[in-house]
Amino acid sequence: MPHPFDLSLYLVTDRRLTAERGLLETVEEAVAGGVTLVQLRDPEAKGRALAEEARALIGLLRPKGIPLIINDRVDVAAAVGAEGVHLGQDDLDPAAARAILGPDAIIGLSVGSLEELSASNLGPVDYVGCGPINATGTKGDAGGAIGIEGFAFLRSHIALPMVGIGGLKAEDAEAVMQAGANGIAVVSALCAAPDVTEAARTLKTIIETSRR
């Protein structure tokens, strides 16, 4: 049984966007505004540096009951005791990640098309990240935008909890939630916001209102 998790407002970090403010400060301000889950995504960091970032984030997040998900790096997630890992289509198979991390780990998987869904082993997966809904500049290999319609189509084929991702801003949140999302994953909408806490509060309010 995985750690409890809430996909409502899911922050995916980008060190390029948090350089001026700092990673820890950005995440702390985002959590103050209502972020419910944090993914550490830093593809440029080597293993040791990534582990140091992860340990610092765990120290910040765990006392607040917010899980830390590591992007791609199952080895780092295991080494630092992070709550979970998020895998892309070209990463380690979810079953292998589950075998390494154990039954309590949260395992997420990116899916952007019906073809990817058909090729995916969802058995060990706890949630699906679906997108990119909009064009995005924060992930070069994200693929073409699928739009709200594409998200809704995949939602109709996936029973697992789903989070929408990809170039999402506050004005997109209501439509994504109404298309069946369990939450919204954002990068620049928070990491590049002048006031991270206020931006998170705005998103969280829209998400909660859209559920009613």
UniProtKB/Swiss-Prot annotation:
It comes from the Bacteria. GO terms for cellular component: cytoplasm. CDD domains: TMP_TenI. It holds the Pfam family TMP-TENI. One of its GO terms (molecular function) is magnesium ion binding. 2-[(2R,5Z)-2-carboxy-4-methylthiazol-5(2H)-ylidene]ethyl phosphate binds at residues 136-138, 167, 187-188. Keywords: Magnesium, Metal-binding, Thiamine biosynthesis, Transferase. GO terms for biological process: thiamine biosynthetic process; thiamine diphosphate biosynthetic process. It catalyses: 2-[(2R,5Z)-2-carboxy-4-methylthiazol-5(2H)-ylidene]ethyl phosphate + 4-amino-2-methyl-5-(diphosphooxymethyl)pyrimidine + 2 H(+) = thiamine phosphate + CO2 + diphosphate; 2-(2-carboxy-4-methylthiazol-5-yl)ethyl phosphate + 4-amino-2-methyl-5-(diphosphooxymethyl)pyrimidine + 2 H(+) = thiamine phosphate + CO2 + diphosphate; 4-methyl-5-(2-phosphooxyethyl)-thiazole + 4-amino-2-methyl-5-(diphosphooxymethyl)pyrimidine + H(+) = thiamine phosphate + diphosphate. 4-amino-2-methyl-5-(diphosphooxymethyl)pyrimidine binds at residues 39-41, 71, 110, 139. InterPro entries: Aldolase_TIM (IPR013785), ThiamineP_synth_sf (IPR036206), ThiamineP_synth_TenI (IPR022998), TMP_synthase (IPR034291). Mg(2+) binds at residues 72, 91. Pathway: Cofactor biosynthesis; thiamine diphosphate biosynthesis; thiamine phosphate from 4-amino-2-methyl-5-diphosphomethylpyrimidine and 4-methyl-5-(2-phosphoethyl)-thiazole: step 1/1. It is an enzyme of class 2 (transferase). Its cofactor is Mg(2+). Its EC number is 2.5.1.3. The keyword Lipid biosynthesis does not apply. Binds 1 Mg(2+) ion per subunit. Belongs to the thiamine-phosphate synthase family. Condenses 4-methyl-5-(beta-hydroxyethyl)thiazole monophosphate (THZ-P) and 2-methyl-4-amino-5-hydroxymethyl pyrimidine pyrophosphate (HMP-PP) to form thiamine monophosphate (TMP). This is Thiamine-phosphate synthase.
